[in-house]
Amino acid sequence: MTFDDNIRILVKDKEYDMPFSKGLLARSLTAAGMKPSASYTLARDIERELNEQNVLKISKDELRRRVYYTLINRDYEAIAEKYLLWRRILKKHSIIILVGGSSGVGTSTIAFELASRLGIPSVIGTDSIREVMRRSISKDLVPMLYESSYTAWTALRKSSWEEQDSKEMHLLGFERHVEPVLLGIESIIDRSLTEGTSVIIEGTHIVPGLMAEKYQEMPNVIFLNLTLSSEETHKKRFIARAKVSDRPLERYLENFEIIKEINQYIVEKSKENNLPVIENVSISDTVQKCLEIVTERFSNLNDEPIIDSDFY
């Protein structure tokens, strides 16, 4: 049977039917830790098996069982267990993933990759939250908010830093810049938890130790903090970003030492709070590591029977 001969298969849900999709199934498998190529191959094999058996309709539960036992039979036991874990959790609980890191370490890229793998429809950058906060807080009240994270120190009153060294001054400015943005971030988290919706929030303003401690205790609020130890790699990220955006390269390079200080500050805060720090050299490796961390946190929510979800 060729690809064009495939029979249209409907997956039955409680409220509606939907066409079987290899892409959806492959995405579910990659979220469980399977390599994308292997995920698509297995999804294609499942479709072929259903076609050969002339299956026109199949329930989500039955499809899930087929996928699970296919994984077991192909010696993917660990992935099979993670696959079921994801299915149990995603519909039952809202998941809030916070991807932090200094400018240029790649929080946006990783956040969108995770959203694609996990099927989370909403990704919010903290720069956007900052713009909203600027509309409600005047420049006279918090001038640091109207600067970049690495230039916020220039808006400090002289009395705030005249007895501090340059690094302390830079970090104080960064903290004053971050604090009002955190109000917006925490409001989004609270609303997501109340409404039962999942979201990924990414950006420089996610700083452990500055956010309310209660979020670190919640198993479905997951902190992922990225870093780049190599100065050369970090600078190359800025160069690459400047080629595809309007962000001025010179401004980043001129303030690179301050950006490094902020990066180290976020790393130290993460370690102080026993939160993961991930070296973001390879996008694929970073995404895989993030998925492993998220899955481990999910195990604390694994208290429900398998239920329907928007994934297979």
From Swiss-Prot:
Question: For the ATP-cone domain, which residue ranges apply?
Answer: 7-94
Region forming the signal peptide: none
Q: Which InterPro entries match?
A: 2PKG, ATP-cone_dom, P-loop_NTPase
Q: Please state the pathway this protein functions in, per its UniProt record.
A: Thermoadapter biosynthesis; cyclic 2,3-diphosphoglycerate biosynthesis; cyclic 2,3-diphosphoglycerate from 2-phospho-D-glycerate: step 1/2
Spell out the reaction equation it catalyses: (2R)-2-phosphoglycerate + ATP = (2R)-2,3-bisphosphoglycerate + ADP + H(+)
Q: What does this protein do?
A: Catalyzes the phosphorylation of 2-phosphoglycerate to 2,3-diphosphoglycerate. Involved in the biosynthesis of cyclic 2,3-bisphosphoglycerate, a thermoprotectant.
Cofactor section: a divalent metal cation
Q: Which GO MF terms are attached to this record?
A: ATP binding; kinase activity; phosphotransferase activity, carboxyl group as acceptor
Q: Which UniProt keywords apply?
A: ATP-binding, Kinase, Nucleotide-binding, Transferase
Q: Which family does it belong to?
A: Belongs to the 2-phosphoglycerate kinase family.
EC number per UniProt: 2.7.2.16
Q: What is this protein called?
A: 2-phosphoglycerate kinase
- Gene3D superfamilies per the record? P-loop containing nucleotide triphosphate hydrolases
